[in-house]
Amino acid sequence: MIVGSEKYTTRQLLAWFWRIFRRVKLQSFINAMSGIVRVGLDFAFIWATKLAIDLATGVSSSSFIPRPSTLFGAGVLLISIMAFQLALGYLGRWIAALMGVEAQNRMQRHIFEHLLRSEWRGKEQRHSGDVLNRMVSDSQTVVNVVTDTIPQALAVLVRLVCAFFFLFSMDAMLAVGVTAILPVFILLSRLYINRMRAITREVRQTDSRVQATLQESIQHRLILKTLERVPLLVQTLSSLQATLRHQVRYRTLFSSTSNLILNIGFGGAYLFAFLWSVNRLADGAITFGMMTAFIQLCGQIQGPFRELTHFIPAIISSFTAAERLMELEETPLEDDGEPIRFCHGAGIRITNLTFAYDAHSRQIFRHADFDFPSGSTTAILGETGAGKTTLIRLILALLKPNEGTVEMYSEGEAAVPVSARTRCNLVYVPQGNSLFSGTLRWNLQMGKPDATETEMFEALHLACADFVNTLPDGLDTRIGEGGAGLSEGQAQRIAIARALLRQGCILLLDEATSALDQQTEQALLKNLIEHHQQLPVKPTLIFITHRTAVVEHCSQVITLEKKK
């Protein structure tokens, strides 16, 4: 019996698997039916083999099933059954491959979308490498079990039951003797499953740490080079791989030993069946054809037992994978209802704000009040750790206040607490490089998917990014991960142009000009202020900055102090 972990009960795990099954039930049904039809063909082949041998040896037997009366007819029947077996195997593999990819993609999309739409708690609980490992490896494990392993197991059970009754109809004593290993199999399975599940979880956790180390090291390889710490990371990776190797070795030893014990039992049962058949043949109680059928049916009974021993590790791995995926789904989703748009401008009012990232962290804000009127231009100053970026995240509804309110308001309209539904009014330029790998055009379309080239070039001009016109491929210039191929200043200006394409009445810029020289910064700020003053509805601008050039263009300055 498979038991739940300390975190999830068996019922919770089975309920989760049922939800996954409902998404891929067509493929599971097709695979199960394909397996059951194969079982029928296998037994038909056994019956046809017995028939051919009986005809060849001149033995006649009565049967209620219509059958050929000549050896030629029996041969044609055998060839026909084999042809059906080959065709079914070919078609089954083709369908399983195509539908398997679709099921895997659907599972990954579900996890991917949940992660992107879930609430952000301010601190990532898991390394991105671990998350990717779960999305790719664990989702594949779960899909394979639901769409392939379980349907195969169903077909195996059908094969086992049919083989037992087929053999029982020929020789009851032999059928009972061959299946006597079943109680031992069940007992060993219970002991095996509990231990194997714990080992599998340790292996998956170590595998995630290996992937996290690889990803982070590749991402920061320039830093590792300049700090001359490449040997240290290679040693760290080797240590993790050694741990993984030890865990896999132990898992393999444990699994192989368990299988060896079962195979000894299977071998003994097969030997019993062979000797029993030889003895019965010597006594003249059975024919050569019946002996051949006995041996084949014993294989049809023992084969399922062997296959079930192979299915158990896969099912155990799937339960471990399910737990890891369920952990990713624990974070609640944001409220993604109908967007709340402010068509005539909006401001932000913050009242009695108290916020800390968790119960053990210092309070970033304590009973704080701020007001950013509609159409105003505000600079937010303060030392590192004073809460400037945190304030922006609260306005974006990425974080929730512990106490107090953060509201969006406009004259003539009721104030609304900020949420994912009010995010449509906000345009955000984060600090650092925020470009995606791909073309410049695609990055700009992230701000406005249907933007025309004219609109793109206007936004680029306002952001002082006219250098795009001089690039050989223009808007179709490809950049690498993290904006590779552009300087920090160029990447920052592309990010600002992308933000300008997005329609919103509140613009949030978090150190958006930090990588620009003074002359370019002044030109960009001048373009930005003049452009927004010409709009029918003057937007609200909020700058987080350390630069005095930005402060000179603002009507309001807020200085944050770091709380002790």
List each language-model region with its residue ranges.
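Cytosolic ends of transmembrane helices, especially the final helix of ABC transmembrane type-1 domains
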Residues: 229, 253, 297-328
